[in-house]
Amino acid sequence: MIFGGLFGGGREATRAQVAVVRDITIGRMVRLDALAWRRLAGGTFTLDRDTLEITAQGIIKLDDGGGYVHRFYTDDEMMLQAVSQQPDGSDADDFTLFRPWSSTYATGGWDDAAFRDRLSQPRWDEAGLPPFRRFWYDGDERVQPPVQLWEALYYERDGAPVKHIRQQCMLYVRDLAPEGQELLLALSARPEGGDTTHDIMIGLPLSPAEFSA
């Protein structure tokens, strides 16, 4: 399942070169099948184009052999994510397309603590969105801690990471007809030496046939 390995996280060591996953990397263009979102009834995810120009790339190494998360970004913060067991992404088989919904700066420690408390809940309610149930810990209605990750972000294929971002996050889901799902990724993100933001992203699972580079 999408994000199935995200139950822990560690900082990825500096890499000499970023991975190329299904021909996707910095500087490449990704083509999308718009039917992936248009065929779903009642979906919140919308996109007014069917191409993504990748200008940045992130990598997350999961703890305990959980694999790797590869993230490909556009200038307007669309994110295509792939999950793999191998660091080069050659065996990636879980793909999700995310678009930003909202992003706000934390106004203080109390604000960040309140947001982290929301990340622990089995249900996510957000203004302007239908309710989502927790995807991780599915069926468990107890309070659960957010997943913690370190993401190394690159702007150049052969360059060093430009920043490392600590994230506390939780993934939520709701069902759509016919036989589809929509995801909500809620995260508290803080770059080293930077300010904390609270971000909401709406996601759509993709099959390998629904995109190409």
Could you say what each language-model-derived stretch is?
Residues 1-51, 57-213:
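Mixed-charge, low-complexity intrinsically disordered regions
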